[in-house]
Amino acid sequence: MTGRMIGAAEALAIGLVNQVVPPGEHVAAAARLAEEIAANAPLAVGLAKRLVDLGSNVDKHTFLALELLAQSVLLRSEDAREGARALAERRPPRFTGR
C-alpha cells in the first residue's frame, strides 16, 4: 500500500505470493496450481471464489453472514460426506459437486 516496488523474494517472504518460479516457468506453474485447485470439491471451490468476488463489495457483517451460509451449505453437501468417508477409508475423495 506504500507504492514501493518489491522483488519476488520479498513478496514471497511477506506472504503476498505463495510461490516464485524461474523465468519462463510461470505458465506451467499456473497450470499445476489450477489442477490442484480443480482436484478439490467443486462446490467448495465455487463458493470460495464467489465469496472472494463479493468480499470487497459488501460490509463485514454481510460478508460474515454469507460465509456462514456458505459453510452451512457445504457441511450438508454430499461432497462433505464423501470427504469424511474418504478420510476414514484412507483413500482419495471422489467429489461430484453435490
Predicted stretch roles:
Residues 54-55, 90-94:
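A short structural micro-motif
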Residues 51, 55, 70-75:
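Helix-loop "lid/cap" segments that line or gate small-molecule binding pockets
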Residues 1-45, 68-69, 76-77, 81-85, ...:
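Crotonase-fold acyl-CoA enzyme core
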